[in-house]
Each structure stands twice: as structure tokens, then as C-alpha cells.
């Protein structure tokens, strides 16, 4: 297949309509926001030619303008208040929208090598540029049929749970032509209220942030030419088989797949049996905090669990045992831990805190990091032409970073996108579907 050329045909800043209330209000980042990646996260969805023909760019943009009025942080900008704190300025400045044309057919691109031009399918935001929009969208139409909606949002605005709600609400706004839709819970101060006096009980400076003792300092680098992006499809029958392996213990799809991936990637890496390996697991804290935070809270509410095992134990253990290690680690992110983290945020309010997000080229080996969008309801992402035919993963060159998303092709199936050292790829391919 010939190289696909993507040409930007239009660029504009789209303001909320109607403008949201706020009048330039300054909202400080919570400690959860400060722990999130200080950068833009791309998300891309594709619709085939028939679905794309039913969607006009104007309708998509009108829906975006309508939904932005209910998500004012995405339409705002970063600023600094009189106390020197990084804040959101809720000023209705708007989102950047690009329209683009790609030569060729989307179906051909998906069947062959869309990865070769995937980084041209979303806006290239610059987090260091003054007044940079916090949400940027690109509508790319293929000349022979097909549409890709690529969006980047700054991670300190919202986590994956929040952005999944935003995307489905945007689709609903287009599909219903502006019918009244609910506003999410937006009160950041209510979800990060410290005790008086604050009493942090854990080493948050070195766990959630890049303190001098942080494990993030120990990871090496890998030449980018050795990074390989992989996509592994787990059909629903395979997922059911994994759950059966766990037996009577209650096991989520995510826990089963993570146990499997952890085992197989560790085996493919051919690590020393005496070495230890851990996984950094994102944990949604909305239902774990005390009191619980509304599920529709728009912002960041994620901390991390760190299941850890010796390689020999991981490879020899049953699936049920590995799931148990994962479940126990996640359970430690409880109400007490979350309140301690909030209290730490108050104690360190004036400190410079660097999140632990990895840079491109980082090699997590012998460890992994995982994020899950399995709960994302792709079937609800219907702008009027039906749900997307594909989720397109960005090129994220970090060895050992995994992302689970629900399959667009098979209900109950899951796609695993990951980057891995090229030297370990063939070994993983040979064993990735083995449950031995």
C-alpha cells in the first residue's frame, strides 16, 4: 500500500455554545491532577465509509460546541494564581479543531499499515506553548471513504474514565441535535478535602511522584528503533477460558487478562528466576474514597497499585494465585490510603512535584505498566452513523506499557496494545495464546 498523505485543510478554535458559567474562575489542580501525566494523551476512533457518509463535519463540530459548555475545564486554559499554583482558568477559550483529508481508503489502511501514518491523525499539541488549548480534535476524512476522529486532551484535566464519559456525551449531543443532557460532577474541591490537620501516613512523594527514592529513577532507556508496537486480539472465547482457569474465585476480565499478560511477557523476556517483577496498575478511586466520589466526576481520580512477584513464582503460579496477588495490591488502595494521599497534597501544596510518567524510550523491563479502558462503552460512541469500527492506538514507545480496550469487532473480546523490545516480540508471539 502506498504511503498515505494527510493534509490539514482547516484549523479553528471552537468555543462552547452556549458559553459555560465561570467568567474566568481559577480552579487549582487537585493532588490527583498533579500526579497525572503532564502532557497530552491521544485517542483515535475510526468509522467506515458508510458510517462516515452519515456524519457531517459541521454536525460533529456543533455537538462539540454544545458539549463543551458542560465540560468547562476542557474549554479553559492553564494559568497560575496569585499564590503561584497551577490552575484551570474557566474562560471558555475553546478547543482547537482541525479538518484534514487523507488520500486513500480507510478500510485499506486498517487492513495494511495504518500505523505508518497514525501520528498524523491527531493534533500535535505542545504542552509548553502559552495558551495551548487543553482539548484538540482532528476530523480526518479519507478520500475513498472513512473517517477518523483523533483527539488529544491534557491528562491533568481528566483521566480515562472522565474522557470516556466526555466522548459518549459528545456523541449524544451530535445524535440528539442538542437535546438537554446532564452535566457531570465538576467540584474539584469536594473530591480532595484534607483532614485538619492533614496526616499523610504513606510515602507519597516517592510513590505517586518522582522523589529521590522513586522507583521511576531506576528504569533504563531503549533505542527507539528497538521498540515494537503490538496489537493482540483476545476473542471472547479466550477470555472465558481464562476465567475458567481462575476457577471459583470472582475474577474481572481485566484481572484475568493482566495475569495472563504478566506471565507471558515475563516469560518472553527470559528474566532470571530470582529477579522480581511488578506491574503499575491504574486504580479508579471514585468508589474507594470516603465518602465515595460520584462516578460522573470529571477530573482525575486515579492512584496506582503495584502487584509484585519473584519471576520463578509468577511463572509457576496458577492463574488464580496471580489474580490474587493483583487483587490484594489493588485492595491496598483503600479509603485510608486515598485520604493519606489527599492529606499529602495539602502538606506539599507549595512544593514542586513531578509526576512519575515515563518518557518515550523508557524500558520498564522487568516491570510493566497497564491501563484499562475495558469499561469504555464503545457501542455508545455513536454520532449518528453507528459505533466506531476500530480504536487506533497511538505510537507510544515505552517498553512494557500495556493498554486494554474492548474490541470493536467482537462483543466480549478485548484488544491489548503494547510496546515491547523487538528482541522479545517473537517469543511473545509464540506463547501469547497459550494458557500452559
Swiss-Prot record:
Entry annotated with the keyword Cytoplasm: no
Family: Belongs to the plant acyltransferase family.
Function recorded in the entry: Hydroxycinnamoyl transferase that catalyzes the transfer of an acyl from p-coumaryol-CoA to tryptamine, to produce coumaroyl tryptamine. Serotonin, tyramine, and to a lesser extent agmatine, serve as acyl acceptors in vitro. Can use caffeoyl-CoA, and to a lesser extent benzoyl-CoA, as acyl donors.
UniProt EC number: 2.3.1.-
InterPro entries xref list: CAT-like_dom_sf, Plant_Fungal_Acyltransferase
GO molecular function: acyltransferase activity, transferring groups other than amino-acyl groups; hydroxycinnamoyltransferase activity
This protein's name: Tryptamine hydroxycinnamoyltransferase 1
EC class name: transferase
Record-annotated active site: 155 (proton acceptor), 382 (proton acceptor)
A Pfam family the protein falls into: Transferase
Domain of life: Eukaryota
Keywords from the named record: Acyltransferase, Transferase
